């Protein structure tokens, strides 16, 4: 679990660097994002990296003021990743209840629908939703592994 979080954090940092550089220089990030997707292909964070880099690619054309956008987007990212980190342990170690999932969804929604500048609103909504999807993806993956393990006992 700790490895997963560290890898996801590292991948987020790498994608964020490409995103930030592209926003401030206007360079096309498609190749750099594809290289990141290739780098993490076959790992536990493959889906997360694929989803996050696509969000970043689709957000770039919306950016009008890179400095303002990136400052707020960084704040969004930090808050979203805290929700992810705080709940990943529960996903990896326990059975999630409906109340747990509802709490996670509310935390992510609160971030996604906070009072962000209009330019950053879409990024906040999409990234906060993506974190919920990623937690669910990992939960489903681990639950299936558990089910498969019991078949051999």
Regions found by a protein language model. Give the residues of each.
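Repeat-associated, polar segments at repeat-unit boundaries in modular proteins
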Residues: 42-74, 119-143
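Amphipathic, heptad-repeat alpha-helical segments
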Residues: 74-98
């Amino acid at each position: 679990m700790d490895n997963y979080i560290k890898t996801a954090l590292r991948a987020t940092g790498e994608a964020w660097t490409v995103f930030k550089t592209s926003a401030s220089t206007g360079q096309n990030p498609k190749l750099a994002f594809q290289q990141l997707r290739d780098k993490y292909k076959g790992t536990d964070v493959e889906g997360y990296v694929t989803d996050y880099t696509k969000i970043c690619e689709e957000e770039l054309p919306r950016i009008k003021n890179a400095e303002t956008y990136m400052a707020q987007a960084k704040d969004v990212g930090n808050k979203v990743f805290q929700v992810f980190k705080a709940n990943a342990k529960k996903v990896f170690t326990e059975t999630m209840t409906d109340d747990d999932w509802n709490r996670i969804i509310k935390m992510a929604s609160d971030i996604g629908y906070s009072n962000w500048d209009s330019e950053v609103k879409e990024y906040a909504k999409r990234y906060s939703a993506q974190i919920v999807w990623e937690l669910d993806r990992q939960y489903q993956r681990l639950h299936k592994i558990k089910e498969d393990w019991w078949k051999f006992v």
